[in-house]
A protein has these predicted regions:
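Short coil/loop residues immediately preceding or within conserved phosphate-binding loops
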Residues: 65, 109, 175
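Cytochrome P450 core scaffold surrounding the K-helix E-X-X-R motif
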Residues: 40-48
């Protein structure tokens, strides 16, 4: 099937085009996109040609935080049902043979075909916008789990952008005492209100 796509055609160059999405195989799911989260960091670097993962080959379709509805499921899929609202993280969208999208995940498309193992049903009470940020939570979750904070342990988090705020909240959730620092007053204010025990303006 043909679907619309946001295609990065070069550094700071974006076009709306179309790509072919295949029917799902036995273990795959076809997802109709509702929304995709945009990361100021990763997405911003990618469009500027500064992605840290290596050289970018254009044209390419980026996007790695798809929220959508299950439109079709393969014969062996048992984890989701038709109509389920789901999140798809960094998994690459499978395209028809010959549809080149470079090295990116390719979730800036109207539909995506993904293996069921990378699809998570979204619980009731979680909005589409909240769910679309699921991909960026991976960094602070991994960091918190690797450091295994103990109750009352003091933790310093430098930077209070989206990932820093999430990290602070995750550490506090484990019982750590959290100090945050940022050079932007608005981030410090938000951090003091919802993320940190102590928020410092380090400018």
């Amino acid at each position: 099937m043909r679907t619309k796509a946001v295609i990065f055609t070069g550094v700071n160059k974006v076009e709306i085009g179309e790509v072919n999405i295949p029917k799902p195989g036995p273990t795959e799911v076809l997802v109709r996109t509702i929304i995709t989260g945009i990361s100021v960091g990763t997405d911003g670097w990618y469009i500027k040609g500064l992605y840290l993962g290596g050289q970018i080959r254009y044209p390419t379709i980026y996007g790695y935080q798809r929220v959508g509805l299950v439109e079709e499921i393969g014969s062996e899929v048992v984890t989701v049902n038709l109509g389920d609202r789901v999140f798809v993280g960094t998994a690459r969208t499978r395209l028809e043979p010959g549809s080149r999208i470079g090295d990116a995940a390719g979730n800036y498309t109207g539909f995506g075909c993904h293996d069921a193992s990378v699809i998570v049903a979204i619980p009731d009470g979680v909005s589409n916008i909240e769910a679309s940020m699921g991909g960026v939570t991976a960094t602070p979750v991994v960091g918190r789990n690797l450091t295994d904070p103990q109750q009352g342990e003091l933790v310093l988090i430098l930077g209070q952008g989206m990932i820093g705020q999430m990290a602070a909240q995750l550490y506090r959730d484990k019982g750590a005492r959290v100090i945050t620092a940022d050079i932007l007053a608005n981030r410090v204010a938000i951090s003091q209100k919802i993320s940190a025990d102590i928020a410092i303006n380090s400018s």
